[in-house]
Amino acid sequence: MGTNYRRVLLKLSGEALMGNMGYGIDPEVVKEIAQEIAEVIATGVQIAIVVGGGNIFRGVKAASAGMDRATADYIGMIATVMNAMTLQDSLERIGVQTRVQTAIAMQELAEPYIRRRAIRHLEKGRVVIFGAGSGNPFFTTDTTAALRAAEIDAEVIFKATKVDGVYDADPEIYPNAKRYNSLTYAHVLAQDLRVMDSTAIALCKENNIPILVFDLTTRGNIRRAVLGESIGTLVGGSCEIS
């Protein structure tokens, strides 16, 4: 079966890994995500992943409570490495070769982030998981996803969330909210639709990297996205509401 993409970057929030738990990592959820990734790898598509850390620690929240912002962000980076290693373990248990690369040196645990090495791993069919964000405080993991996607020449960013796309209003508050099928980068920025932070959107716009926002909790959606099926909201095209 043909796929729409050769190389994709999957952005997973930390919250996606905790399932219905209020904190931490749900092993069953991680196992399901790993299985979906394995199915996509089997089609020949190359996958890189950026993971967040909000299920363990949120730097912005800690900073608002009085912690030094840079320190809080560094702790958040460590949380992303915990998530990356957990996902790596689940993938390797089902036979998917995986490498974790971190933007902060943790040589006993993971490779350092080296762009050429990451690309070589992808070409060999390995999943590459990027941990520790960009290695710099004050930048989100969404911005890291946009940055890494540009660096490795990914054709698209899959932003896997708990909602089935981008809406013109919060669907939990406004039941008549409309879901966008597609959006321009400019509309996202002008309407502050919070698909990703503005730095990430600007990076994607500058490098012509589309962003597909879809519901991770629907089994098979990662594969559907790779196959080009109509799911979620595509940022980078025209503005079209459903």
UniProtKB/Swiss-Prot annotation:
It catalyses: UMP + ATP = UDP + ADP. GO terms for molecular function: ATP binding; UMP kinase activity. Allosterically activated by GTP. Inhibited by UTP. InterPro entries: AceGlu_kinase-like_sf, Asp/Glu/Uridylate_kinase, Uridylate_kinase, Uridylate_kinase_bac. Gene3D superfamilies: Acetylglutamate kinase-like (3.40.1160.10). The keyword Transferase applies. GO terms for biological process: 'de novo' CTP biosynthetic process; UDP biosynthetic process. Residues 19-24 are annotated as: Involved in allosteric activation by GTP. It is an enzyme of class 2 (transferase). Homohexamer. This is Uridylate kinase. The gene is pyrH.
